[in-house]
Amino acid sequence: MSYLIEQCKRLKEASYALGMISTKDKDEALRLIIDSIKRNKDDILAENDKDVLAAKEKGTKDSLIDRLKLTEDRIQGILEGIETIIGLKDPIWRSNDVWTLENGLTISKMTVPLGVIGIIYESRPNVTVDAFSLALKSGNCILLRGSSSAIHSNKMIVSAIKEGLRRSKVSEDIIELIEDTDRNVVKEMLTLNEYIDVIIPRGGADLIRFVVDHATVPTIETGIGNCHIYVDESANLENAIQIITNAKIQRPGVCNACETTLIHEDIAPKFLPMLAAALKDKVELKGCPRTREIIQAAEATDMDWAEEYLDYILAVKVVSNVDEAIGHIQAYGTKHSEAIITENYTNANYFLRRVDAAAVYVNASTRFTDGGAFGFGGEMGISTQKTHARGPMGLNELVTMKYTVVGNGQIRQ
């Protein structure tokens, strides 16, 4: 028997008991984990430094190292996320629909945990805490498979979590970390239907495609983020500059960063020089022929329109109207996050309804597509599929339902 199967058996067994743990005891366990992470903070940062140093020695680009890096401020943000989750309503054992039939049967739809969640993710060690905290509050056990680039960070974080659980009424067997970084272990994980109820891949296109292609366990697909911002002819140009700058520069290595900006042709002569000045010496611009007639930019190819750069690069295209902008998004977007900057109510409403994406914005940065920013305390990932869950997956997306039927002797005639 492989060690992975032993881990999964422990998780499956623990899942039966976890579903019966009270909200009070789950919240107390999360508070003890906050305390444990605080006490182990220096060790977590030291282990993270090992991962960051190894990434730099491999020549990893800065935007990806930023995803890997933990700081005191980021750990504080992680802890605040747990506090938010503690304050949220427990999503399980809630009967949202109850009705009584003519024969006297009372039927209700009750929310229940998924069971055992497997998550496969890249680089970001904060996901370890976010995913676990959401799983615990929603009554789910979790199997974590982070990337080799964050192995030291993840091992120390999971050790701190287990330390907190040992002081609580919740078993430490509800969380397991796969420490073997061999991809063949992932292949095995993807086929363990007997033990794992759902797998969530969270990372780049290659990882997500690998999981979808090889999994027999049900998956919730999180997509890459080729996100667009369309600047309409009626846009407040100062707002547009501020929004695009934030969406591109604040953290370019994340999936909700803007990768392409679409500009209405009527404002392009005025707006493009403003944009170029705002991004000067910070972002490489790649433009369509009409863009390059107005500002200096590298030539954009079809591959550029489809690229999730995760870097200080922005593709720019001039379009004739909102329909051409939407057409471009439909052709190249990844159904993640899309935005329009406009003062035209009709165009805003049209864009909101026509664009097919998990999150669609009017006059705001795409960077808000995030469980923490949405008030969920964290996220298991951002789903770009349409079944079960879509957008940032918080507590309410980590449950399923069952029908409870209560009678007093009824039989089917």
From Swiss-Prot:
A Pfam family this chain is assigned to? Aldedh
* Record SUPFAM superfamilies: ALDH-like
**Where is it located?**
Cytoplasm
Highest taxon of the source?
Answer: Bacteria
Pathway, per record: Amino-acid biosynthesis; L-proline biosynthesis; L-glutamate 5-semialdehyde from L-glutamate: step 2/2
Q: Name one GO cellular component term.
A: cytoplasm
Q: Does the keyword Amino-acid biosynthesis apply?
A: yes
Main location class: cytoplasm
Reactions catalysed, as given in the entry:
L-glutamate 5-semialdehyde + phosphate + NADP(+) = L-glutamyl 5-phosphate + NADPH + H(+)
Signal peptide span: none
Q: What GO terms describe the biological role, i.e. biological process, of this protein? A: L-proline biosynthetic process
Q: Which UniProt keywords apply?
A: Amino-acid biosynthesis, Cytoplasm, NADP, Oxidoreductase, Proline biosynthesis
Enzyme Commission no: 1.2.1.41
UniProt lists the family membership as follows:
Belongs to the gamma-glutamyl phosphate reductase family.
In UniProt terms, what function does this protein have? Catalyzes the NADPH-dependent reduction of L-glutamate 5-phosphate into L-glutamate 5-semialdehyde and phosphate. The product spontaneously undergoes cyclization to form 1-pyrroline-5-carboxylate.
Which protein is depicted?
Gamma-glutamyl phosphate reductase
- Organism per entry: Alkaliphilus oremlandii (strain OhILAs)
